[in-house]
Amino acid sequence: MADERVSASGGMETSFGFREVGTGEKQPLVNDVFHKVAKRYDIMNDVMSAGLHRVWKDAMIAALNPPGREDYRVLDVAGGTGDIAFRIVERSGRKAQATVLDINGSMLSVGAERARKKGIEANLEFVEANAEDLPFAANSFDAYTIAFGIRNVPRIEVALREAYRVLKRGGRLLVLEFSEVEMPLLDRFYDAWSFNAIPKFGKLITGDDAPYQYLVESIRKFPNQRDFAAMIRDAGFARVSFTNYTGGIAALHSGWKI
């Protein structure tokens, strides 16, 4: 299930929240959202997940279990503020090397400053680039991670193929993303929280509810767990699986390049 579609006029369209936009229009719109929330991104994730994103991210890093080797290289995509990369570096005993890639310079600036304050900048590289066109040679990384970012990519299938290309043989893909709630009653509560509470909290915290409204809508437009797993397989990955967190509010997807 690709996110890209042919419009009635023959052009390629994708979703920006509940709006249909041209494929080329989505990235600037997404960039504007994250320029607005960059300095409060972690607070935004707390609002979006009621703080559970921290538990989910820790579970993601536990699943990756990065070894304490200096030649272990991870590419963390859409990871501008460094939240995942920092966890990887610390879990490896400050041995692993993490490249943080984001298309948004504001997010990367926040991440680079945080890395300096933590004293781990030697283990990190910050790269401003597009997930659909990675500036790296094939077979460069041992792992590719992306947390709460893949749904913002205009052409998800292209980004997945790029992930496959830059991974080494035996490399692992891990995608953490909001997903489809699979627990009865929880889905109703989550819908009420998402559409009523999250934009209001967002406006209270940042003065602007529009970025939060988009993010809530983008979750609903993202493929469900099984459809997204099929997209990962279509990109060439093997041993594809997913694990639901908190009844399916989020899911961790895994695939291997073998």
From Swiss-Prot:
InterPro entries reported for this sequence: SAM-dependent_MTases_sf, UbiE/COQ5_MeTrFase, UbiE/COQ5_MeTrFase_CS
UniProt cross-references to Pfam families, sorted A to Z: Ubie_methyltran
GO MF, any single term: 2-methoxy-6-polyprenyl-1,4-benzoquinol methyltransferase activity
E.C. number: 2.1.1.163, 2.1.1.201
UniProt key word Transferase: yes
Pathway given in the UniProt record: Quinol/quinone metabolism; menaquinone biosynthesis; menaquinol from 1,4-dihydroxy-2-naphthoate: step 2/2; Cofactor biosynthesis; ubiquinone biosynthesis
Ligand binding (S-adenosyl-L-methionine): T81, D102, N130, A131
Keyword entries, A-Z: Menaquinone biosynthesis, Methyltransferase, S-adenosyl-L-methionine, Transferase, Ubiquinone biosynthesis
UniProt record, GO biological process: aerobic respiration; menaquinone biosynthetic process; methylation
Chemical reaction(s) catalysed: a 2-demethylmenaquinol + S-adenosyl-L-methionine = a menaquinol + S-adenosyl-L-homocysteine + H(+); a 2-methoxy-6-(all-trans-polyprenyl)benzene-1,4-diol + S-adenosyl-L-methionine = a 5-methoxy-2-methyl-3-(all-trans-polyprenyl)benzene-1,4-diol + S-adenosyl-L-homocysteine + H(+)
Listed PANTHER family: 2-METHOXY-6-POLYPRENYL-1,4-BENZOQUINOL METHYLASE, MITOCHONDRIAL, METHYLTRANSFERASE
Function: Methyltransferase required for the conversion of demethylmenaquinol (DMKH2) to menaquinol (MKH2) and the conversion of 2-polyprenyl-6-methoxy-1,4-benzoquinol (DDMQH2) to 2-polyprenyl-3-methyl-6-methoxy-1,4-benzoquinol (DMQH2).
Family affiliation: Belongs to the class I-like SAM-binding methyltransferase superfamily. MenG/UbiE family.
Annotated protein name in UniProt: Ubiquinone/menaquinone biosynthesis C-methyltransferase UbiE
UniProt gene name: ubiE
